[in-house]
Amino acid sequence: MSEDPKNIKRALISVYDKTGLEDLARALDNAGVEIVSTGSTAKKIADLGIDVTPVEKLTGFPECLEGRVKTLHPRVHAGILADTRKEDHLKQLEELEVEPFQLVVVNLYPFRETVASGADFDGCVEQIDIGGPSMVRAAAKNHPSVAVVVDPARYGDVADAVANGGFTLEERRGLARDAFLHTADYDAAVSAWFVDQLSDGDVTTPLRYGENSHQSATVTRIGTTGLANAKQFNGKEMSYNNYQDADAAWRAAWDHERPCVAIIKHANPCGIAVSEESIAAAHRAAHACDPMSAFGGVIAVNREVTVEMAEQVKEIFTEVIVAPSYEEGAIEVLKAKKNLRVLQAEHEAPKEEVKYISGGMLTQEPDTYQAEGDNPANWTLAAGEALNESDLAQLEFAWRSVRAVKSNAILLAKDNATVGVGMGQVNRVDSAKLAVERANTLADGANRAEGSFAASDAFFPFADGLEVLLEAGVKAVVQPGGSIRDEEVIEAAKKAGVTMYFTGTRHFFH
């Protein structure tokens, strides 16, 4: 990116931190730059014997409300926001008798420092800057015409720029980036402080330790809903791992619209089931998927926990149970297990997923059941005969449930419950083998894979993974499709006489 520098003829300066202001003002003055400034900044510059135009002279409107209103005026912001590349903008400025700025230098009220000093609520609120961020954001937006500086450490760059014809477009873009980061950080500090002030307890709470005993950890509560803000009725304090597993279970349970129970261990499902009969029936079915792994697991429910279900849970060693509500008497039943953590939480769909990596972070929209391919009405019949309504509902249950399984994921379901889960394998064949093995060995030696409904979170790259399921006797398969070997996979399903649907939507989970 290259462009001739934009000459700086007029600058707006409004700074709380006066560090480096004298050198900056002298550099601008020596270069013949007209300086417009506010309040104490203008006074400091004038005291140096440097010509400065007070902003109230520019606007024709006095500073008022104890300094709350200084620069929030069209004559200021028109001069900042005018895109001087556009003839109509220049014409409007001429008609309004407004001169454009080429440089805006601002730093903000010391909000963080005020909070750290122990100031009271009103004192902290008074240090929330309004006009400063408005000027910074306006100048950053209009970086093709304006350079914005928010850090006194960059004043030397300003001096160099005014002496050498101004900042280039590339440099102004970099300054705009820094400015938006600055205002975002400032707003984050203000919003976090408000959350802290208005919450019932500490926003950030230390945990006993992290994933392992040598790791420190905390939980930070944002807002008032969701798992982090759950009300705890019983049991020991929540641990880092408890929160991890409870979150995975909570997500799995709320992936279903029907009454659902999800049991999780090490962030993977031991069992998931839905039931219109009762939530207790859903719990029995979820537990039956893998009773051994469910020992010491975490349970999440998307409906009210009944006394009947509580009586069942009481008989099984469970670390955590979380639900939106509890039937009268259910909590008293669960309290018989003194170490069982009993949580009540208001469901809140996540707005964003964040993962820190070396040198930065990743963000993404959460993977919820909202894609077109998640609706069975939009599935493509790739092999076999179309399923009747009842069987299609079973296959949809498998598809909804497989999203809770770590990739590569294969899930087998029957009678609205998982019966075999193959999770976290580095190839899809092993995931299929694991799902079949667990279906056929974890419950009284029953051959549960036969006649089950299979879901794969991503396509089969070869027919071999599907063939494992076909040999086990699955009734139908749902998968995204999209492999370059789809025809090979389809042919295997057709040869076995097994129905297979393509969703066109993938649900990787890492």
UniProtKB/Swiss-Prot annotation:
GO terms for cellular component: cytosol. It catalyses: (6R)-10-formyltetrahydrofolate + 5-amino-1-(5-phospho-beta-D-ribosyl)imidazole-4-carboxamide = 5-formamido-1-(5-phospho-D-ribosyl)imidazole-4-carboxamide + (6S)-5,6,7,8-tetrahydrofolate; IMP + H2O = 5-formamido-1-(5-phospho-D-ribosyl)imidazole-4-carboxamide. SMART domains: AICARFT_IMPCHas, MGS. SUPFAM superfamilies: Cytidine deaminase-like, Methylglyoxal synthase-like. One of its GO terms (biological process) is 'de novo' IMP biosynthetic process. Its EC number is 2.1.2.3, 3.5.4.10. Residues 2-150 form the MGS-like domain. Keywords: Hydrolase, Multifunctional enzyme, Purine biosynthesis, Transferase. Pfam families: AICARFT_IMPCHas (PF01808), MGS (PF02142). Pathway: Purine metabolism; IMP biosynthesis via de novo pathway; 5-formamido-1-(5-phospho-D-ribosyl)imidazole-4-carboxamide from 5-amino-1-(5-phospho-D-ribosyl)imidazole-4-carboxamide (10-formyl THF route): step 1/1; Purine metabolism; IMP biosynthesis via de novo pathway; IMP from 5-formamido-1-(5-phospho-D-ribosyl)imidazole-4-carboxamide: step 1/1. The keyword Hydrolase applies. InterPro entries: AICAR_Tfase_dup_dom_sf, Cytidine_deaminase-like, MGS-like_dom, MGS-like_dom_sf, PurH-like. GO terms for molecular function: IMP cyclohydrolase activity; phosphoribosylaminoimidazolecarboxamide formyltransferase activity. The IMP cyclohydrolase activity resides in the N-terminal region. HAMAP family: PurH (MF_00139). Belongs to the PurH family. NCBIfam families: PRK00881.1 (NF002049), purH (TIGR00355). This is Bifunctional purine biosynthesis protein PurH. The lineage of its organism: Bacteria, Bacillati, Actinomycetota, Actinomycetes, Mycobacteriales.
